[in-house]
Each structure stands twice: as C-alpha cells, then as structure tokens.
Amino acid sequence: MLCAVAVFCTSPLFAQSDSLSFRNAQFTSSRVADSWKKFNDTLSKEFKHKNVAYPPKDIYLRAFKSQNEMELWARNNESSEYKLIKTYRICAISGSLGPKRVQGDRQVPEGYYFIEDFNNKSDYYLSLQLNYPNYSDQMQGNQKTGGDIYIHGGCVTVGCMPMTDPGIQEIYTLCLNARLNGQLYIPVHIYPTRMNKSGLSYLNKEYANDATKQQFWSELKAGYEYFEKYHKLLPVMYTPDGKYVE
C-alpha cells in the first residue's frame, strides 16, 4: 500500500476569483510591488534566453545543503522537460546533513515539499512557507516535529533557507508569477548534497555508521537520479510508515 500526494481541481470560475483575491492581497504590500518592479523584467529576459515562457507555467526549486545552492528549473507544459534557468546561493545553512526530525533541532529539512504560503509581511523581508512537516516527516519524526520552515530574506537561519533580501525579492516574484499563472503547487526538493558519485562517496564516508540517514538518503537518491536522467519529476509517494518510494 502506498500513499500519494494528490492535487484536486476546482471550477474555473472559483479558481479565477481565488487568484484575483490572492493577487490583490499580495500587492497590498509595498515589498511585493517593489520586488515585482525590480525583478520581473529581468526574469522575463532570463526565461526567454532559455526558450521558456514567462510568466512561467511550471517551476521547480531544487536545493543542496552542502553546496548552499538552490536551482531554479522551469518548463512550458507537463509533457516537456524542465530546463535549468539559474542557480541561487543559499546565504546560510544551520544544523547538519540529514532530515529534520524534532522541533528545535535547527535542522534544515530534507525531502520533497511544496510552497504552501506566500508571506508578504515576513520579519525576513518576504518568505515562502514550505509544507513541513510532510507525511514522511510526521511518520518518521518525533511527535513534536516543529514547523514554520521558510525560504526567506536575510542571512540568518535556525532551520530555514535565507536567500538575502535581493535574493528573496527575485524568488518571491518568480513564484508569485507562477502561482498567478495557475501553478498552485510549486515543488521544492531539498537534498543533503548533489547525489552524484562524489556526493554519495562523501555521505558514505562521513555517515558510514548512521544506518537511519543512509536509508533515508537512499530513498531520495531514486528521485534525484530520475530527474537527472529525464528532467521530469516523479509523483511524491510514501509507504504507510513514511518512506519515500518511486
């Protein structure tokens, strides 16, 4: 038995009304309006250079903790491959490699998430909330898993991913564009490192005696390798006890 992440459709009229309300609420913030004005044209040119439509219809963020990097991928439709648009620098990372399992451990989570909230009144300029804890975190973690994991501005973190204020201005504008263009679920996948030959060698060497982390990383490795080969995402699926599966 497997559990899968499902996306439910709404009527076009409701979706249009909801999108308009969401847009109006977002642009009450001068931070959002200023960010849009500053970065929207630049993003449009970068997408055009990659032959990807803008505003985007489908974007994907992929982060690597060891490298302090977050990649932006995009595609024109569900049948096409994602293209790498650019790579952002994560300003700081707290905790160690491995998933977040308990509240207050200062860990940046690892696994498969999506953006569930746009916070235009953040203490860190702007922020994008992830759906942590997801099903895997809830089943595999402590009863008190914590929450409030964001991609945000600034350069201070106790478990989030700070991108600097200019960085979050651009990323927020990008994600807001995708949301307003119909993408309700923007995937954000977080890995301990690039899971290529050298990355896996490092994990096997440094965490050879940590069977729990090794098992978890083997689950993430399958999704990483599939995307590297096809530039497409697998559906996020779990076993009843919270393990990721293809």
Language model features by range: what are they?
Residues 190-192:
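Hydrophobic transmembrane alpha-helices
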Residues 16-158, 166-186, 195-246:
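Cell wall/extracellular polymer interaction/catalysis modules
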Residues 163:
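A conserved hydrophobic position in a structured secondary element of the catalytic/binding core
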Residues 1-19:
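Bacterial Sec-dependent N-terminal signal peptides
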